[in-house]
Amino acid sequence: MNQTTTLSTELTELGVRVQNRWLQSLLDYLAKKHSTGANTTPQLVMQYLVASDIRESTTSEGAAPYIVSEQHNVRIENTMLLQIVRVREIGISIVNQLEYLNDLEELKKLKGQKVIRLVHDESGDEEQNDDDGLTEAQDAVQKGSELKKMCRLILEDSNGQRFWGLERKPIKGIQLSTKLGTKLLVKNVLVRRGVLMLDPNNTTILGGSIEEWDKDYFPKRLIEELKGELSKTKA
């Protein structure tokens, strides 16, 4: 049994079904760049897999077995590997979310200003005690650090089918700041009115992201999306 077949079998046991072509390309890359091809483990492959687009790296065997949006009171027992396209907090008003996200964006800017000022101080410039509101911004963000009630997700499988998932109970690792492209393993999940009912017992967060999707998304692009959604509700 060659290395590709061995790794593919081991990954399948973990609930992940990779495309042989993608796996072989990864092994060739590792052998050439890092000289680790002979010692490649399933855990190492997973590090690259969670950073990939599962439409390109995994097979349809790990996808939803039918059109999810058309199902009701159906349980999907097999393991699905999915990636997060969007996260929405539906237990907190959009207005409150925007207040929190704007405070967070302001904090990022103030931290940048603070770093620049410290560089100037080390250069011999006069030190200033005013933190330009950094403390106030930190306090504001800290108050919103538990900005989590119930999340609704847009999920995608290896066939490119997209559908909703809803937290029935809080799942650690799912919140507004979750990276787009984060991978999940979902097993034995109930579908109600076309929505996956997610909880910690049927959902495992693998992590990762898709760089193209996630770049500059949180909080900058998320703020713009929420503003657009808010304006539609007022129209």
UniProtKB/Swiss-Prot annotation:
The protein in question is named RecQ-mediated genome instability protein 1
One GO CC term on file = RecQ family helicase-topoisomerase III complex
Q: Which PANTHER family would you find in this protein's record?
A: RECQ-MEDIATED GENOME INSTABILITY PROTEIN 1, RECQ-MEDIATED GENOME INSTABILITY PROTEIN 1 RMI1
Please give the family membership noted in the entry: Belongs to the RMI1 family.
Q: Which GO terms describe its biological process?
A: cell division; double-strand break repair via homologous recombination; meiotic cell cycle
* Cell compartment(s), UniProt: Cytoplasm; Nucleus
Function per UniProt: Structure-specific DNA-binding protein with a preference for cruciform structures. Also binds single-stranded DNA (ssDNA). Functions together with top3 to maintain genome integrity. Essential for proper meiotic cell division. Required for normal S-phase progression and DNA damage response.
Q: Which domain of life is it from?
A: Eukaryota
Listed A to Z, the keywords are: Cell cycle, Cell division, Cytoplasm, DNA damage, DNA-binding, Meiosis, Nucleus
Instruction: Give the primary localization class.
Output: cytoplasm
Task: Kindly give the SMART domains that the UniProt entry links to this protein.
Answer: DUF1767
**What are the protein's GO molecular function terms?**
four-way junction DNA binding
